[in-house]
Structure formats: C-alpha cells, structure tokens
Amino acid sequence: MKKFPIALQLYSVREDMGQDFEGTLKKVKELGYDGVEFAGLFGKSAAEVKALVEKYDLVPISAHVPFVDMMADPEKVLGDYAEIGCKFVAIPYLTEEYRPGTEGFQKTIDGARLLGEIAKKKGMQLLYHNHDFEFVKLDGKYALDVLYDTI
C-alpha cells in the first residue's frame, strides 16, 4: 500500500518550537510526520532551518506568515521561506485595520498583489487562510472573492 505523506502545522506546537526548535522538529519526525508547515522561525536563519529540515528529513511544505511581517520586508521574508524550500506561503489572518470594510483593506489588496508577484518569482504560491470576516459583500462582491482574484 502506498503511504500518504502527512505534515504537521507547527502552530499546534508553537510553545515547544519556541523552547526547543530543533528538538521539536526531531520529535515531529519521530512521531511519523513527513513534512511541516511553519508558523514562525523563532529567531533562526533560513539556512539554519533548511539544515534542520534536511537533517530530520522533513519536507517544508508551507508557512503561515502574518501579513504585516511579510509586508515589512517582502523580498527577504519570502526569500527566506523559498530558501528553506517552502512551496507555499499563507497570510494566516488579518488584524482589524486590514479587514474588509476598513480603509486598510485596500492595503491588503495591494499588498497581496505584491506578495503574490514576489512569491511567484521565487517559485512559491501565495495562499490566504480565510475566516468569517471575509464573507461580507463589497460593491456586490464577497471580500474573499476580491482577495482570491488578487492572489
């Protein structure tokens, strides 16, 4: 029977990652996981993280990175995750000032467009983790559809 690869969203073990990054990755592998989705690098460089996922034979599937963190230095942040080997990077959540129905939502749309372009140049795809607040209509169109059309 063919084995179906399973990855762990590291947000679920974020406290452990903060205390013992390498030890947690080792344990994740020992538990039988094949890959991981990052939720922060906890002060580690991309090169350090890449070496660790290679050491423990874990596939770096993707990463959830806060929108404001990506927008602070898009080239570097997305470059780091590309260096690690992630194929996907997701905006996990929007703080209230960037949500649909606020003046900041246009910054979200513009930022997502930029992030998507940079991600594509680096061989990755930008994703968006939706929530209930994207299901409001703006000019007759759901905000989530506006975001997806942008990404």
Go through each PLM region and give its residues.
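N-terminal pre-domain/capping segments
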Residues: 1-88
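Active-site acidic/histidine proton-transfer and metal-coordination neighborhood
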Residues: 35, 67-151
